[in-house]
């Protein structure tokens, strides 16, 4: 069996085009364009690349993009003060603070300072809690982007045995909640899981997010499984690969995401969707 490739690049472009049309319609109706503030502290090269792609996507769809590039020496108090100002700014619908933050700044405190209505990354405990309660509002971008991919490929997830490898707050844990909402029987594995291979071999839908190149061998994949590879790992030769051995897995899976060009573009596309949603649901003038 040769797997069908899930083309995240194409689906992400569709999502962005849909958002751009909605933004044009808003402006034509006399409403303002959504605004996103992107905050980068320090000069981490990978973070700079991610931030640049987010800003570019904003401008492409017609958002107002505001950039805050702060020096490595920025204190936690200064960063929190900026977030307070952005929370109070009525032209800003979304606030994105690029992680990781420099040593000495508490990630949790910073993310919790962002108002839940402007938490377009979907990391605030309020928004994660809404997802757990089956009443999601702004959803974590990577898990939501994966669900969008499955929906756009008309993959019926109800009743599937889904296995999530990796239990991070950014992907693994919220992904498990999204899969429950999507009707899956969901298992989350982590560093203490025994007999990982057994879980993988029984997965109808496998989502891998550990950040280790080639962590899952292709011969572990169940025949006909759907494989979603969230890993983005740069090898010493410069090649970018996922957490799954792609060539081998693609021989057994029914669908598989490539790396690059699979999940990555959907994360940014979902951020754009979330910013529009925040603008419409929380910050537009409400009819009395």
Swiss-Prot record:
GO terms for molecular function: methenyltetrahydrofolate cyclohydrolase activity; methylenetetrahydrofolate dehydrogenase (NADP+) activity. Pathway: One-carbon metabolism; tetrahydrofolate interconversion. GO terms for biological process: L-histidine biosynthetic process; methionine biosynthetic process; purine nucleotide biosynthetic process; tetrahydrofolate interconversion. Homodimer. Belongs to the tetrahydrofolate dehydrogenase/cyclohydrolase family. Catalyzes the oxidation of 5,10-methylenetetrahydrofolate to 5,10-methenyltetrahydrofolate and then the hydrolysis of 5,10-methenyltetrahydrofolate to 10-formyltetrahydrofolate. This is Bifunctional protein FolD. The lineage of its organism: Bacteria, Pseudomonadati, Pseudomonadota, Gammaproteobacteria, Enterobacterales. The gene is folD.
């Amino acid at each position: 069996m040769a797997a069908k490739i899930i083309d995240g690049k194409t689906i992400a472009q569709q999502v962005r085009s849909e958002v751009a049309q909605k933004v044009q319609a808003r402006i034509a109706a006399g409403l303002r364009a959504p605004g996103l503030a992107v905050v980068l502290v320090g000069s981490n090269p990978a973070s700079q690349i991610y931030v640049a792609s987010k800003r570019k996507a904003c401008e492409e769809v017609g958002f107002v993009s505001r950039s805050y590039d702060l020096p490595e020496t920025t204190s936690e108090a200064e960063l929190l003060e900026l977030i307070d100002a952005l929370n109070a700014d009525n032209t800003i619908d979304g606030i994105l603070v690029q992680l990781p933050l420099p040593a000495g700044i508490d990630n949790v405190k910073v993310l919790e300072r962002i108002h839940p209505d402007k938490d377009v990354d979907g990391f605030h405990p309020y928004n994660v809690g809404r997802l757990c309660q089956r009443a999601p509002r702004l959803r974590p971008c990577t898990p939501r982007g994966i669900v969008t991919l499955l929906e756009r490929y008309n993959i019926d997830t109800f009743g599937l045995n889904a296995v999530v490898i990796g239990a991070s707050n950014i992907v693994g844990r919220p992904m498990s909640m999204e899969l429950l909402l999507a009707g899956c029987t969901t298992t989350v594995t982590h560093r203490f899981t025994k007999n990982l291979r057994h879980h993988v071999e029984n997965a109808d839908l496998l989502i891998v997010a550990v950040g280790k190149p080639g962590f899952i061998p292709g011969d572990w994949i169940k025949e006909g499984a759907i494989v979603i590879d969230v890993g983005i790992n740069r090898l010493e030769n410069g090649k970018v690969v996922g957490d799954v051995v792609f060539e081998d897995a693609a021989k057994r899976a029914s669908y598989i995401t490539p790396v690059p060009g699979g999940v990555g573009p959907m994360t940014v596309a979902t951020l754009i969707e979330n910013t529009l949603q925040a603008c419409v649901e929380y910050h537009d003038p409400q009819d009395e």
